């Protein structure tokens, strides 16, 4: 079974089609009429618009002619480049376009059974976390007999024009498509999770290791059904569509249609002086202005390969506008990468994606308010929603995506297109269960851009530990819904922090409700004991308070370990001490290296401290070798930390 399907406007395709066939009429959609209101609400029409059905435009109309990627698409006099680029990208992976265009063969014109055609189509979009089916009629806007928006160079092919109409209906009108980024569109067509990579900031041309690391990620994404496109930014409007020295167009988005790591045979190793080639195949959606540099069809490299060589290596091209280029040239020529990962197919590990729908809401009570504005609003920032997740091991890449509810359907009522949104990421105590109230010791682990786009992204390699993500609008006191998605190679257990402190219950009242909250950060343990010179010491921490404990990651082969491990405890009394122990991880039996015992009273100094390790037995036990540096903050206000 597929994912749950939401019916837009509650229209049921099969029922509507059966009614039309029974009545012998073509469908006319009452919820998206062939009127100017379905086109624009601000722009002026460049001429008289006549809505025509495909059979009035072509003698032999088809939804798809041959292979969906065989024909080039034109944006039309009122269309936009982002839409054409997204169509081109969508056509690369059959698993994606067949999801957006369900049962495409059943929706096709059948000249042998014209009575089965009812002028009705249905398409599916991933809309704010839900797969949504949109039903439309086949009336398309034309001026002087020509389609106003996108059309195919095969003049009897209509899949893109009909898909575009369904998308316009979903967002309110055709004008609502203006300003959408290719990332927005691809996500809506496929449900993929996007990451935008700045090729220049990544230094992929300078750092060889980073370049091959990028290739590995792109290869994995593509072979798992992801979509990848790239572009060359133009510094000004005048340079849009200007050709580079190597034949590429600025301002246009190229789609990756293949990626290969090739091992060369002995003869080709001598020719190219390398054993491996890292290659990508790209396509220009316009079907022209191909790459003219190395590995292009006119290049010396290409001519040195026989037809058999190309076939054996897989260096083939099936469409006009397709070309091969090396990884090095790819990194050197393109500025921005849109990497859209396929996270909806269980075969590829659906557990890798975790998502939650939330909202920014306003309340006069600071503990109830959930619209605190960006990080600049220090007094209210932590009044935003907060989400915690845990990275189980060092070095995992985590991609975070925050999407606001699309406001385009409200533009005709004077509402803004989008709010400025972003998010902050903090490394927090490993045992945190309640909301953050002040940022005393938390490390700021990352921040997204703040911009008025529909979606903002952040990609980070994170250390093992717990993290709190705070989604925000730039201004405080605004309300809106949002969708937060996190993608990682391992489950991260994303969940919202809703409580400010432990709940009052019969159980904790009987045991004693907490009166003090204590936050501790252990920075380092230095000068640790070695029994003999060549002994390997692999230290780790155990921070205890009563029956609760927090364990740090193991540091390998060092007597001067940097931990920066955080813990937080809600204590019934300061008579319950906090104990920080240092252990040596060994194969059979771990070795105790020493501990410190703290009262952690609210009146204690909050500055960084350093204490010698001692044997077990309290603060007066015998001193051992080594010392730890730490910071402790205690408060009798349970909502301070």
Curated annotation (Swiss-Prot):
Residue ranges crossing the lipid bilayer per the database entry: none
UniProt-listed Pfam families: C2, Calpain_III, Peptidase_C2
Domain of life of the source: Eukaryota
Keyword annotations: Cytoplasm, Cytoskeleton, Microtubule
Residue span of region Domain III: 344-495
Chief subcellular location: cytoplasm
Induction of the gene: Up-regulated during the osteoclasogenic process. Inhibited by dexamethaxone during the osteoclasogenic process.
GO molecular function: calcium-dependent cysteine-type endopeptidase activity; microtubule binding
Domain annotation C2: ranges: 498-621
KW Transport (keyword) present: no
Residue ranges of every copy of the Calpain catalytic domain listed in the record: 26-343
Subcellular location as annotated: Cytoplasm, Perinuclear region; Cytoplasm, Cytoskeleton, Spindle
Record InterPro entries: C2_Calpain, C2_dom, C2_domain_sf, C2_III, Calpain_cysteine_protease, Calpain_domain_III, Calpain_III, Calpain_III_sf
One GO biological process term: microtubule bundle formation
Subunit-structure text: Interacts (via domain III) with microtubules. Interacts (via domain II) with ARHGEF2 (via the N-terminal zinc finger).
Cited PANTHER family: CALPAIN, CALPAIN-6
Protein purpose: Microtubule-stabilizing protein that may be involved in the regulation of microtubule dynamics and cytoskeletal organization. May act as a regulator of RAC1 activity through interaction with ARHGEF2 to control lamellipodial formation and cell mobility. Does not seem to have protease activity as it has lost the active site residues.
Membership in a protein family: Belongs to the peptidase C2 family.
Name of the molecule in the record: Calpain-6
Natural source organism: Mus musculus
Gene name linked to the record: Capn6
